Amino acid sequence: MRYIIIIISQWRSTIMKTAENFFKWAFDTRGRTVIALNNGEEISKEKMFLSFCSHDPAFISHGPAGLNASIKGIGFLPKPEYLEETLEAYLKHIDSFDPEDKTYSQRGLELLVKYMYGPEARDRIDFTCVGSLEMAKMHSYTNYKANPEATLLFYQPPMISYELRGKMEIIDECDSGKREIYQQMINAQHDVYHRPNTSIWLDRPAYLFHIEEVYDNSATKEGFGTKLVYPY
């Protein structure tokens, strides 16, 4: 756990907790699950369900569609300099899909460990943003089109909760008329494990949430809306 000493005045100072614990919880929890599945380890239903708490925050928005919250899956992404390399590996794997091939998901897990969640891959990860997909184009989409201010709220029973504040960028090849690597990347990262369907990628715009602030809302003495130092 990292702390930063902030000088308040000539006579006193305070210690502020950094956002490191959020990323350990959100990224490492997902990583441990992926690595365990790749290793063929048994994971209880209870543990699997809890692991999704770091994957499925509420996306909060406000705009023409009113005040809204929607549960969406999120994922961390490679740094910009690693996007093309990672996407190329994902697409090669997706192109190999055969409905009769029972090894597709396992091979996808191996790629996720290699490029995202393995210990050697950590320096490749961009911890300034998270990505998601829009599958409905309803309230969230309408609001973020007009107002990019966004909050992502995470909760894991019974006590853990984190809040991210920032700006939501909508990335849509149908709007831009050009290749959008983040839209392809986020769709591919979803389909690298699940049954792929590249024909609907154009219908699924990407959200790129740029993190500006991190809060610990956990029901602990260090939580209850405590702002964490970010970046740290």
What are these regions (language model features)?
Residues R2-Y232:
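Binding-site signature for planar aromatic cofactors or substrates
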